[in-house]
């Protein structure tokens, strides 16, 4: 059963990758595919894929997803709280000692362009930390959440990760992939993923 779920999730990720490529054909940089994976990177990718699958299984526990009348509010609440929680965590990963041992692996890629593959190319400890943050957020907000908002939030996070690392210029009123691309280029800016309230507050927002 777990193997079947793993295959389904991987197919879903491939679908998200294709969506990210269809949304925009405008690349932000000509310097794409500037890094070749080593054995350590491949091990990290495999570990992260398995960890994400186990986390998703734990998150839903085979429950039936029912749409609540509070779905829009719950989803917006999740997106904002997740962004505000993840940004300082991401900022902490850029501390010189933590960065050298953990986060540097993700920033080997200065011009990400392979969507999910480049998004997941990170140290296992970084992945575990991010999943623990996600689990903590769901646990805290669980009394007011519905399964549909949790499921759609996971989908949007995965899609956002694919878009942010696609190398493609995608933007709307509240979201620009260029922000995360600039983070990979310059480092100490744009630690948020979507709304950048944290970055605007501490002065690290760059566009």
Name each region found by the language model.
Residues 1-142, 191-207:
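Non-catalytic, topology-defining segments of multipass membrane proteins
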């Amino acid at each position: 059963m777990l193997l079947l779920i793993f295959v389904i999730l991987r197919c879903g990720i491939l679908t998200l990758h294709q969506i990210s490529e269809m949304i925009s054909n405008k690349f932000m940089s000509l310097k794409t595919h500037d890094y070749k994976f080593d054995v350590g990177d491949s091990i990290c990718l495999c570990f992260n894929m398995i960890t994400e699958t186990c986390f998703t299984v734990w998150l839903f526990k085979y429950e039936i997803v029912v749409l609540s009348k509070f779905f829009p509010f719950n989803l917006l609440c999740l997106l904002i709280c997740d962004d505000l929680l993840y940004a300082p965590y991401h900022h902490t990963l850029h501390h010189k000692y933590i960065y050298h041992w953990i986060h540097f692996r993700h920033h080997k890629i200065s011009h990400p362009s392979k969507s999910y593959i480049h998004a997941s190319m990170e140290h296992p400890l970084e992945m575990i930390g991010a999943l623990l943050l996600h689990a903590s957020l769901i646990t805290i907000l669980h009394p007011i959440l519905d399964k549909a908002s949790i499921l759609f939030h996971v989908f949007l996070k995965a899609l956002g990760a694919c878009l942010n690392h696609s190398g493609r210029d995608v933007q709307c009123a509240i979201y620009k992939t260029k922000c995360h691309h600039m983070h990979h280029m310059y480092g100490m800016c744009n630690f948020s993923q979507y709304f950048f309230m944290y970055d605007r507050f501490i002065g690290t927002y760059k566009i």
